[in-house]
Amino acid sequence: MKPRQNPPGNKNMIGAKVVALRKAKKIKQKDFLAKLQTVGLDISATSLSRLEGQYRLVQDYEIVAIAKALDISIEDLLGKRRND
């Protein structure tokens, strides 16, 4: 997939973090889509791309599924620590 050419949007606060975590774990977007499906989130490649680019809002159930698929806590995904 080619790199994003437009600047990120401002519709959500987790898109950039999802990309960074996914890339740190060496998970391709296609593989991440499959992983999301295994945790119960059926999302299209376009929708995931828009989420990662911060061009769409994120639903609460999507946050839960993304955290589960990345094997991290919701707090870590949101950038918050438990004692903040």
Question: What positions do the PLM features span?
Answer:
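A short, Lys/Arg-rich alpha-helix, primarily the initiator
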Residues: 1-25
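Alpha-helical residues within the helix-turn-helix
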Residues: 23, 34, 68
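Short, basic-rich loop-to-helix N-cap that marks the start of a DNA-contacting helix
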Residues: 55-65
